[in-house]
Amino acid sequence: MAKMRAVDAAMYVLEKEGITTAFGVPGAAINPFYSAMRKHGGIRHILARHVEGASHMAEGYTRATAGNIGVCLGTSGPAGTDMITALYSASADSIPILCITGQAPRARLHKEDFQAVDIEAIAKPVSKMAVTVREAALVPRVLQQAFHLMRSGRPGPVLVDLPFDVQVAEIEFDPDMYEPLPVYKPAASRMQIEKAVEMLIQAERPVIVAGGGVINADAAALLQQFAELTSVPVIPTLMGWGCIPDDHELMAGMVGLQTAHRYGNATLLASDMVFGIGNRFANRHTGSVEKYTEGRKIVHIDIEPTQIGRVLCPDLGIVSDAKAALTLLVEVAQEMQKAGRLPCRKEWVADCQQRKRTLLRKTHFDNVPVKPQRVYEEMNKAFGRDVCYVTTIGLSQIAAAQMLHVFKDRHWINCGQAGPLGWTIPAALGVCAADPKRNVVAISGDFDFQFLIEELAVGAQFNIPYIHVLVNNAYLGLIRQSQRAFDMDYCVQLAFENINSSEVNGYGVDHVKVAEGLGCKAIRVFKPEDIAPAFEQAKALMAQYRVPVVVEVILERVTNISMGSELDNVMEFEDIADNAADAPTETCFMHYE
């Protein structure tokens, strides 16, 4: 059997597991791993400017394409702790990423050695496995188990910590004998699925709630097929958005307290059954459980056993991978269709479509400074059907979810449960690295943009082009809006007179100068009529220079975005739409190509 360093064996494992890209920042304690990566070849390395940035790039890489696993590399100590936010974000959204850290030699682990920290203990609560490998011969097997765990059951992240002496130790390993472990996914039984479909048939006004598990399982096509067979409207969650095109007749809108459509909430409240697949009934989707479940039967299908009953007690709970369940659901529905047992739901579908045509929010404003709604309207016009949006949190994200349109799975890339500021730039770079031909447009408010702004240099250095729409109100907008309940506007202002950039008109940071200083291109817009030309200019600059292009739109300082405490108590702070001119890019008024 061949003898080699443990890190050289690790390279063979990564190759056999399909890894071709890694994001990271080298350091003394991880240098042996980097030496093996250089020697082995086959892995493209993208150098981040911050290890947290690298870990969010790995998230974006995984989320972009089915089957991907993003890899993040860092040294000991602070590099590992910098990865914790991404591990939390990935764990919360069931996203597999592999974080590999260097560590002090084993003999120094408990002697307060330089940058020696118990990263295993720190990372365990936010990962499926976190382990410091103390025996060199175990390195390939620990990595094998890591890939098995990341892919099996509810997907999630893993951290593998490698002490310096473990990395360089010589072990016996035969690469030709290595095989990835079989992946385990729980699957619904035929009896369970037949019961679920029978309950669906009995309902008069059912809706399917499709969550991120449908996207993670690469089951969007099956979801749409099942909905079409049964004529049941679909309500995607924020993480499931794109599983059915926004302009599909059965797309009933999103539901919730913030990232929701008026017509979506109205349809849910009019329903008598919720058929949940791959969703977790998050509180910002449901509001109070009492209101959400009132008068409705609930079916819940999820890959994670402990999700069934965690938030609400369903009438039928099934533990299953979404793809396995939907495969059987389609099969059973087809059999019932042939037997003439599927009810006609034309009236219910027509009611949903009517709400979709009439319960709209106004987006067309000509105000100066610009209202954010107009920005999203212009984005709908400019970027077309194939656009892939990347965003994280804040009023910019909430308004985007209310007003943009998504037509394909994995074309709304959003960290859902964790919502860390700074996520958008590195995640967008990770998406582009996974699929360089994808039409990626990122959306940030000014605070999210500033958190990890240095990662724009990565896009410039490695020629990773995308468009970043920056909506700037010089405020922590979502926090300002939530502070209204406390009758304050406290510690949330980002505006100041910039002594070096009078042209920003008191909005503080000159994002154009910063972006250009990092090697990117940037455009600033003050008037609504200049937004569309700026987007066209951005496309041309991106094609010419192959770098990120920032389009900053200076907004009015204060805009309150629709949100509320219950599904039937969402406050509309702006005018609602009365006609097509008020909301010209809604799918009922505009054809998307």
Curated annotation (Swiss-Prot):
Known catalytic reactions: 2 glyoxylate + H(+) = 2-hydroxy-3-oxopropanoate + CO2
SUPFAM superfamilies from the UniProt entry: DHS-like NAD/FAD-binding domain, Thiamin diphosphate-binding fold (THDP-binding)
One annotated GO molecular function: magnesium ion binding
GO cellular component terms, A-Z: acetolactate synthase complex
Cofactor binding remark: Binds 1 Mg(2+) ion per subunit.
InterPro entries xrefs: DHS-like_NAD/FAD-binding_dom, Gcl_TPP-bd, Glyox_carbo_lig, THDP-binding, Thiamin_PyroP_enz_cen_dom, Thiamin_PyroP_enz_TPP-bd_dom, TPP_enz, TPP_enzyme_TPP-bd
Gene3D superfamilies to which the protein is assigned, alphabetical: 3.40.50.970, TPP-binding domain
Protein's name in the database: Glyoxylate carboligase
Encoding gene, per UniProt annotation: gcl
